[in-house]
Every structure is written in structure tokens, then in C-alpha cells.
Regions:
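Nucleotide and nucleotide-moiety/phosphate-recognizing core
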Residues: 3-13, 19-102, 111-113, 201, ...
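Flexible, gly/pro- and Lys/Arg-enriched active-site loops
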Residues: 53-60, 75-78, 82-176
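Conserved small/polar residues in nucleotide/adenosyl-binding loops
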Residues: 226-227
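Short polar catalytic/cofactor-binding loops
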Residues: 16-20, 190-194
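Structural motif
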Residues: 132-133, 183-187, 195, 220-222
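N-terminal amphipathic alpha-helix/helix-capping segment at the start of soluble metabolic enzymes
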Residues: 169-190
Length: 228
């Protein structure tokens, strides 16, 4: 006798951080979600760096979103999200509302469901329609999804928000590269004996470091290092 397959639901979660290693906290949250036996990551957005809203005297945020499939109920999913926040070090004590946080994992959408049980859980997120820092990552994955209350697509809602002081970024080590701000040039440094262009020239560390410095002085951004 086969067991019934539990029904799965689509949910979109918004993630944000403005303290410490922001990228690490967001990626650790996504990894923790994906390791849950009743959650599967379906898609992820780009990263966006944004100015804080509401409470402005705090560091800039790194924001993103992920789409998941889950057999958890909305409240079970909320418990998972809040446990992940706690495990990664978020504390809400003595922190102003909308203030700094190590990481924030919010349920933005859950199928076409509408939930409102007061302060604990509101779906769709109560301020989704006014937050470009949530809508833009959501539009990377589900631009045509229709808000179940406002009856407008995510892409349409995004056009009604201000995206000033918000940029798509690529985290590179401890830096943030804004997409489209400049053309990036990558240098290729081969430390192999059989490279077509410079085989055997950088087998010793001194020669490799000299060429890497020359690349940096010439304006190269990253250096791709290939070795045996």
C-alpha cells in the first residue's frame, strides 16, 4: 500500500542583512532552508544593495529572495524561518522596529493564500507593495505572479515604487560590485606547463606574483589563477 504524497506549495521568501558578513548570513539562511526535509529551493534572485527604509540611521542592506516548494503550512514555515534567524544570531531585544539585523527571513507569498492573524503572520507581506528591495528580487523569479489582494503582478507593483539608491550587486570577497557601473576586466594567470599562451612562464611563485602585480597596475579587476 503506497502512502499519500504530501501536497506541496510554492512560497517566496525575502532575505536581508545589514550587519557583519551580509552575504554569508543570506547564503547560510538559504542553505539551512534547503537542508530542511520539507523544503526545496527552486530559484534564487540576484543580490541588491539598498538604503535602509523607515529607520534610516543604520548600515546599508544586502537583499535577496528565494522561491521554495514546501509541504509545511504557513505557520510551520514561519517557525522554520524564525529558528534560522535565531541560529544565525539575530536578536530582537533592544532593537528598534525595522532596525539593524544579522538576517531577516520573511514569508512574502505562499501560493495565492491570504493570511492575517495579527502581528504573528500576514501573507502576502503587509508592505510588499511598497518595498522595491523586496519586489525587485521577487521579480527576478516571479514577475508575473499576481498579488492575491491587489490583483496586480509583481512587475506592475515594482513600477509603482522608487528604486533610487538601490543597485544589483555581485559580492566579491569583501567588496560589492555594482552591475553595469563599469566594464570589468579579468586577467588569466596560468601556472601550468602546457598553456597555449604562457605555458611554463609562471611555474615559480615570484614570476606569478610579478605578473599578477602588473595586471593589477594595468587595471585588471579579478585575476583567475590556474595551476596544477
Amino acid at each position: 500500500m503506497s502512502l499519500p504524497v504530501p501536497s506541496t506549495h510554492m512560497a517566496i521568501l525575502a532575505l536581508g542583512s545589514n550587519l557583519g558578513e551580509r552575504k554569508h548570513y543570506i547564503e547560510a539562511s538559504v542553505q539551512a532552508l534547503d537542508q530542511h526535509p520539507k523544503i526545496q529551493i527552486v530559484d534564487t534572485s540576484f543580490f541588491y544593495e539598498t538604503a535602509p527604509m523607515y529607520y534610516e540611521d543604520q548600515p546599508r542592506f544586502l537583499n535577496g529572495a528565494c522561491k521554495i516548494q514546501t509541504s509545511l503550512t504557513p505557520h510551520e514555515l514561519l517557525d522554520v524561518c524564525q529558528n534560522i534567524e535565531k541560529q544565525l544570531g539575530r536578536s530582537k531585544e533592544h532593537v528598534p522596529r525595522n532596525g539593524p539585523r544579522v538576517v531577516d527571513v520573511d514569508i512574502v507569498l505562499y501560493d495565492n493564500l491570504v493570511v492575517n492573524d495579527g502581528d504573528r503572520l500576514i501573507i502576502p507581506h503587509a508592505r510588499l507593495h511598497e518595498r522595491a528591495f523586496v519586489l525587485r528580487p521577487v521579480c527576478d523569479m516571479a514577475p508575473s505572479f499576481v498579488h492575491p489582494i491587489l490583483q496586480r503582478t509583481m512587475a506592475s507593483l515594482l513600477t509603482s515604487t522608487s528604486m533610487a539608491d538601490m543597485s544589483r550587486v555581485m559580492p566579491v570577497r569583501h567588496d560589492m560590485w555594482a552591475w553595469g557601473s563599469k566594464t570589468r576586466v579579468m586577467g588569466i594567470l596560468n601556472a601550468t606547463p602546457d598553456s597555449f599562451s604562457d605555458g611554463g612562464e609562471h611555474m615559480h611563485i615570484d614570476a606569478a606574483m610579478k605578473t599578477a602585480r602588473q595586471m593589477a597596475e594595468a587595471g585588471v579587476d579579478p585575476v583567475s589563477y590556474t595551476h596544477l
